[in-house]
Amino acid sequence: MLLFAPTPPPSPATAHRRPGGSAASCIRCSSVRELDRSPSRPPLPPLAEAKRVVLVRHGQSTWNADGRIQGSSDFSVLTPKGESQAETSRLMLLADSFDACFTSPLARSRRTAEIIWDTRDKDLIPDYDLREIDLYSFQGLLKHEGKEKYGALFQQWQKNPSDCSIDGHYPVRELWDRAQGCWERILTHEGKSVLVVAHNAVNQALVATSLGLGTEYFRTLLQSNCGASVLDFTPQPGGRPPSVCLNRLNQTPSSPISAESSAGRKSSKRIILVCQGATQSSSEGSLGGVGYAPLNMLGVIQAQKTAELLLDLKVNSIICSPQVAAVDTATAICEVQEAAGCLGADCVPRYVEMKNLLGLEIDDAFLTKQKSLEQIVQSGWMGGMEHQKLKTLWAQSEDAWQALVNELPEDDGAESDRVVVAIGHPAIHLGLLCRCLNLTMDYMPSFHLDDGSISVIDFPDGPKGGGIVRCTNYTAHLGRWSVPITKSTENNDEF
């Protein structure tokens, strides 16, 4: 049985909020643009209790496979590959507990939701505002047909979508307004954990609007077929909007580094942020992994699992913090990379450049004991850090990010392929993510990273064009040691 959520009238026009709800201008990645031109959207509704929302994009559709522009049309269905992806997502989420499932009513999304939801006893809740972006005359066209028929307009859609008007409409701005309305219904629905199954663009808009990011972030936070993104909403006193933390972005059923394109475009340049493995102090509830703390057994396993995952890539250089846990993680990755060329019949030894970067080092002053282990692993834990320490980390992250970007070549020749792996503490990597997205220090608690996780940033337009975030806090490669999608309400002490 399908239950339909009511659709309210459109919300005010485009603007975005920084954490805390104030409207402010922002720039996309490394490009300097002023896009904050309109009144602020209404804030997220206040919450009485914490809520986790898991966003999943539908599996591959027939029009995905054909390279045809879908928009909000409802002619495509899941391919056999798409059905398989949805089944993999079902298995990935099988042990996770959800109180409700919202879905786009379009066939490709609805079918994905049906496969994932499976035998759960509650009804799916279709919401028409969760449909894919409305692309009007572009819908149904193959991409080369769009170029031939619409020329400059199609090029504008590719290069500057937030300012592109199609048939008198601004699709991205309309999408952002729709997403804001969806949050009103999703967050006021009862339950602590909600699954949302929808589409690429609308899921991007949901992530962005929850964090207060404007339309300039369209195509910056990637959503792959059946990729899962997790958002945590924490109630605030005085009826204020909840604080929001992106716990992970685009955790895909398959490896996040196997794809060679980013937002439909190939990318030969990539930075992979690897959070060092766990140490004894981090396992005991401290902001560990600083100074001389070595990896514990869990950290060794995490480092080896990450090294295996990165075998899908040819890593050119590994840049790590000089601290022991980071160096141990880097060494494990380097040894596997260099041995990979000799695993087949033809032995071709490889050399991977490995060097230390002081900017990735975390000072011993950050070794702060938390009240419990749960505090250090929960979303938004950076929000509890002393302001001066946060400020120090933020200043440090600027030079570190620039040093990593400088490792990428500007030219696009055959020799320009470059994969840089940066290894350090989750705290400094949070600063690097915010630098990539050209955000302020206040956004650092809006993201979360776990020990042993990876985050992938692609540069399809080169380092000067800014980064596209393919995924953050990916831990599926850790197998039985991966971080589950939903939080268990039982055995918290054991966790």
From Swiss-Prot:
Catalysed reactions listed for this entry: 2-carboxy-D-arabinitol 1-phosphate + H2O = 2-carboxy-D-arabinitol + phosphate
GO cellular component labels: chloroplast stroma
Keyword terms? Chloroplast, Hydrolase, Plastid, Transit peptide
Fill in the transit peptide range.
Answer: 1-50
Its BP terms in the Gene Ontology are: dephosphorylation
CDD domains per record:
HP_PGM_like
Region Disordered: list its residue ranges: 1-23
Q: Report the activity regulation comment.
A: Inactivated by oxidized glutathione (GSSG) at pH 8.0.
The EC number on file is 3.1.3.63
Disulfide pairs here are none
Q: Which residues does UniProt mark as catalytic?
A: H58, E132
SMART domains per the UniProt record, alphabetical: PGAM
Supply the name of the protein.
Answer: 2-carboxy-D-arabinitol-1-phosphatase
- Organism, by scientific name, is Triticum aestivum
